[in-house]
């Protein structure tokens, strides 16, 4: 994959660990230091920060965020492949997501995002950072859901939007059904 040129940004010493932790949340696994010369230095992100050992208690989807960002960047550059979209959908199907609720003790969802054309979306988030972009005033609780749970919200809205202030993946009922059909596997339950 061809790299994307970026601007230089100074990260002050007190912000560096947070910055590198956010890179992990966003799906990065390596850092390349290049001062515009032919030689560059590459290193694993985990030589800078400690990779979380157990993320089972934390809702975080670095692989989904990475695959979605790669797909949308390639789409803008007219270089997207169907396999990139398939990978993003596979990661979404296996993801644990957060949805806002008015009262964390209840499963009734309240907040809805509406487009200028009146299309209503229920937001879902890959992690607490993305959830925080939506709930800046801390008005809502967060409830963990799986992909299969998203369809129940379609009774109230036209679709689901994953990370509305990030890659903003919009999913209507047809797209949810297609992703489920393409990724559903027979599982043996013991």
Where are the language model's segments positioned?
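An interfacial alpha-helical scaffold signature
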Residues: 1-190
């Amino acid at each position: 994959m061809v790299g994307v040129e970026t601007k230089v940004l100074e990260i002050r010493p007190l912000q560096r660990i947070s910055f590198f932790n956010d890179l992990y949340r966003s799906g990065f696994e390596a850092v390349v230091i290049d001062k515009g010369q032919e030689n560059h230095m590459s290193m694993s992100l985990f030589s800078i920060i400690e990779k979380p050992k157990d993320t089972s208690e934390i809702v975080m989807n670095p692989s989904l965020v990475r695959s979605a960002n790669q797909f949308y960047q390639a789409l803008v550059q007219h270089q997207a492949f169907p396999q990139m979209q398939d990978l993003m959908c596979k990661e979404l199907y296996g993801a644990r997501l957060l949805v806002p609720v008015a009262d964390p003790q209840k499963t009734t969802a309240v907040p809805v995002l509406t487009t200028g054309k009146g299309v209503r979306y229920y937001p879902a988030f890959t992690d607490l950072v993305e959830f925080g972009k939506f709930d800046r005033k801390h008005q809502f609780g967060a409830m963990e859901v799986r992909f299969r749970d998203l369809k129940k919200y379609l009774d109230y809205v036209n679709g689901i939007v994953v990370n509305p202030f990030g890659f903003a993946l919009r999913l209507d009922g047809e797209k949810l059904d297609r992703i489920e059909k393409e990724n559903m596997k027979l599982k043996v339950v013991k």
